Amino acid sequence: MASTKGKLIHEMVPSKERDPPHSKVTIVGVGQVGMAAAISVLLRDLADELALVDVVEDRLKGEMMDLLHGSLFLKTAKIVADKDYSVTAGSRLVVVTAGARQQEGESRLNLVQRNVNIFKFIIPNIVKYSPNCILLVVSNPVDILTYVAWKLSGLPKHRVIGSGCNLDSARFRYLMSERLGVNSASCHGWIIGEHGDSSVPVWSGVNVAGVGLQSLNPDIGTPKDGEDWKSVHKQVVDSAYEVIKLKGYTSWAIGLSVADLAETILKNLRRVHPVSTHCKGQHGVHDDVFLSLPCVLGSEGITDIINQTLKKEEEAQVQKSAETLWNVQKELTF
């Protein structure tokens, strides 16, 4: 006797023969950052399937159920979760947020070896089930872990991307907007280099409507600057530490940043983002490191790097940023 479903629905194409999802996104790690990224991706309708993976089964099941109970209000057809990486099969984009959480006052670089050990398990499993994916690393220290993910995955470097300074630059533009009274979308400024303490503000390129702030204030960003714009960059560097001190972790801003990058990749928008990429040979960098530079993103990952015109002191800061990372990176075991 036919079931209620059988009486209601006449199947034209057997479910086993139907096309797989075309925009499947996997998020590895369902902590605060992972779930902020998940809801940001869902609310922007970027995926036709979302997969969640974590080692903590109860938390994973609870997060999946919570999302599924609200699925009426979303436009993502399928949300799945499992500790087994087979659930991630066929992903176009895999976002890695898993790792040890940064503690109050802890440098991102201090996290490194703990998270390298976690990546030894995660990355091979991702590639096993989604060999054609683009890998977006968010876990900190993101630049070093993007390098580690590249080495462990065997993927071409243009398909291994770190979230890098996309958020740093957003924070920079927000703080500019607060000073100038102009919407942050109209304030243009780039933070490059390490996502962290040695990041580099490109003061020579900061502008509103094409008007360079350095042309109006030649000392901007220097100790001589009477307006102390240098403190804006210090606020960018310190902001994560401040948020962690206040609420214990960062989540919403990085989640929104991940969705911003995911949209550019999945929709092949070819927008320019400051993301972490293999930068040996760029701006006098000689070591095998990943740093944030302005990159063109699309469905293939990073297709181009913009040759940013930097002043000598800015280029020297990028090289110092690279050296900072290399001094930690060369000691890693994986």
Swiss-Prot record:
Residues 1-22 are annotated as: Disordered. It is found in: Cytoplasm. GO terms for molecular function: L-lactate dehydrogenase activity. Its EC number is 1.1.1.27. The keyword Nucleotide-binding does not apply. PROSITE patterns: L_LDH. This is L-lactate dehydrogenase. Its main location: cytoplasm. Homotetramer. NAD(+) binds at residues 31-59, 101, 140. Signal peptide: none annotated. GO terms for biological process: lactate metabolic process. One of its GO terms (cellular component) is cytoplasm. Substrate binds at R108, N140, R171, T250. It catalyses: (S)-lactate + NAD(+) = pyruvate + NADH + H(+). The keyword Cytoplasm applies. The active site is at H195 (proton acceptor). Keywords: Cytoplasm, NAD, Oxidoreductase. It comes from the Eukaryota. Belongs to the LDH/MDH superfamily. LDH family. Residues 8-22 have a biased composition (Basic and acidic residues). Pathway: Fermentation; pyruvate fermentation to lactate; (S)-lactate from pyruvate: step 1/1. HAMAP family: Lactate_dehydrog.
